[in-house]
Amino acid sequence: MRTITRDELKAKLDRNENIKLCCTLSKIQFNAMHIPGSIHVDSPEVAMKHLNFDDEIIVYCSDINCASSQLAYRILTEKGYKNVRRYEGGLADWQAAG
């Protein structure tokens, strides 16, 4: 599984790189808090409606133990998306950094 660190993600966001940052939390959780610039995708099928095969895609959920971003990563890569990474630390890591 390809991953991205908080510092790498922050740098991409600061540079306004064209990434698709996908939050796999529930809609209620997403509405309460998410990383700025994220889109809500509660299933891989929903994600695929918003994504192109050439997009740089970063999936995340609540923390390192959250399985939904792992599942989204696996399904997207199996469907042929080539540039997918998982932000393992997720929202907990992002918030901890302030």
What is the predicted function of each stretch?
Residues L51-Q95:
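Catalytic cysteine-centered active loop of the rhodanese-like fold, especially the PTP/DSP P-loop
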Residues S26, P44, G90:
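A generic "binding-loop/recognition-motif" signal
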Residues I4, H40-D42:
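Short acidic-hydrophobic, aromatic-tinged amphipathic segments that line or gate anion-handling sites
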Residues F30-P36, M48-F53:
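Short loop/helix-cap segments at secondary-structure boundaries that form the rim of catalytic
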